[in-house]
Amino acid sequence: MIEIVRLVTEHNAKMVGVTGRISIGKSTFARALVDALRREGETVQMISTDDFLYSDKELEEKKIRDPRGFPKTYDSASYEEFLTAVNNGDEATHRVYSHEIYDITDEKRTFRPQGITILEGVNLFYDEADEMAFRKYFDYVIYLDQDPKITWEFYFSRVHEHIAAAEDPDNFFYPFRSMSEAEIERISLEYWNDINMENDRRYIAPTKAYADLIVTLDRAHEISQLEESTPKKGVLR
């Protein structure tokens, strides 16, 4: 992490993006980077693209059928307003996503940019036309990479953690508590292959070419390799 801190600070980056496939550990990595930068005296804040998803109600009203996490399920107008404000050093208001109910809540927060902003999420750059128009707002982008088989194992272990913690009937994972292990695995694998890996193939993996740094993670989610890259320019269609 020391080397990554050096690269971020050498680039004088104020807006840092952390991306990669679902369940690869973006939030964990981003929090570790926040801590490492703060130890070097930097002022750092972190936010997730999850907070810019449409709510279930909005998805229904807009007749958006794409699975949550695909580019069209984000409120790209609000997201771009946020990116513009933060890049200008202005305050920005955003909504809050709940991983318990898997939906946007009624809570709103005010983000006051100071120092470095780390923004983590699966689809950092896409606008409403599925074009990678928002790359221009990021000074430095880190792409997390890993063997998909390892990521699936981590994803499935997290499913079990969520099920064990689901005590509220409104929790997305509460119904799983009455399912057999075979049924849990069948549903999880179906979701993983049909939604998560499809999102990865169509939208997430192509952003690797637009990253400044590719970080490969091993089975223990430790950094095994760093590869500096020259990001592509222009808009990805």
Question: Where do the model's predicted regions map?
Answer:
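Extreme N-terminal, non-catalytic leader segments
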Residues: 1-17, 21
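NTP-dependent small-molecule kinase module
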Residues: 1-6, 112-113, 179-237
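Glycine-rich phosphate-binding loop used to anchor ATP phosphates in small-molecule kinases
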Residues: 12-13, 78-133, 195-207
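Conserved lysine of the Walker
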Residues: 26
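Hydrophobic positions on the alpha1 helix immediately C-terminal to the Walker A/P-loop
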Residues: 29
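Post-Walker A helix-loop "phosphate-sensing" segment adjacent to the P-loop in P-loop NTPases
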Residues: 35-45
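Conserved nucleotide-sensing/catalytic segment adjacent to the nucleotide-binding pocket
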Residues: 45-48, 53-102
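ATP-dependent NMP and nucleoside kinases share a basic, alpha-helical "lid"
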Residues: 105-167, 236-237
